Amino acid sequence: MRMTTRRADSLRAQPALPQWMRMYFYGMHGVTLDILLSSARRFLDDNDFRLLGFSSPYLCIVHSITHLVLEKIYLQKRYFQERPVVFHLVFYPSLYICLQILIGNVVTCTENIRVVSITQLVVHYILALYFTSVFHKGFLSLQYQDKRVLLRSSSPNGLPGVLRFVFFGMHGLLDEVVFTSVFNLFEKADRTLSGHTSLWSFLMYGSCSFVVEKLYFHLHFKRGWGTLQRLPIYICFIYMWEFSWGFALRQYDACSWDYSHYPLNFMGLVTLLYLPGWVCLSLYQDILFNILLRVVCNDRNDKEMPNAGANGRLLPKGKLENDKLHVGFS
């Protein structure tokens, strides 16, 4: 009887991602699209293999809000069950393009309305198809486990490795945009908070954080090491990773950073001046690892999920084991 009750409890619906978490992800996703589009435009114009792209913390906030609006629009697809083509190819793209044009004019704060070219309209339409066919469908299937326990499985990861890599890569782009924007604010008094990064940073941060996460699982869960014991290993690995990537990219004139004018640098690829920043980022990474452990995918192939993204509950993730693992940040 008790086993039956446990089984029923384990199959209880998991809550959807809370709104603050969705907006956090939305901001990162929007900044990533900014970097992708601006770096592609720069590469086509200048053939610059550094793949520099631009965004700002302001735009991150704007993206969080606009993505939330787009989420609400996407959830209206239940009214188009008999006409899905109209929704995916006409209704959603039209509202998406109008919203992007409106936001573009508001952000630039110009008196004259910006003229949108045919190329920009095509890009917006392609992005709208990506949002309605891929992004919303996948993102709104994510669920958030109970904050006190995690269900034990053969691997402690809640999300597939590819999705974790993408998350870490996007977060790395956001980190660099925020850092460079704050740096420009103090050094150049740039109140626009314009920041920049490189598409290569997506691969560098994604792979680095992916490996550091494995170190966290091993050192924290298996060996019981505390934060102060893990931190030196994190820092050494981060510096080694940054140097290795920088050295490789420099061979092809694709390295987007040069610390030669900073003190305590080595070959201009790493500098101890940024040590406090790496320490803070490493501590924050442990928190992110614990949060991601609680995010899982809904494995059910339901055609419609009308409550996805709302404050209700989603369907459970298939068969779940009964063993539970307490997770904390130590």
Task: List where the protein language model places each region.
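Aromatic-rich, lipid-facing transmembrane alpha helices and their immediate juxtamembrane interface loops
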Residues: M1-S330
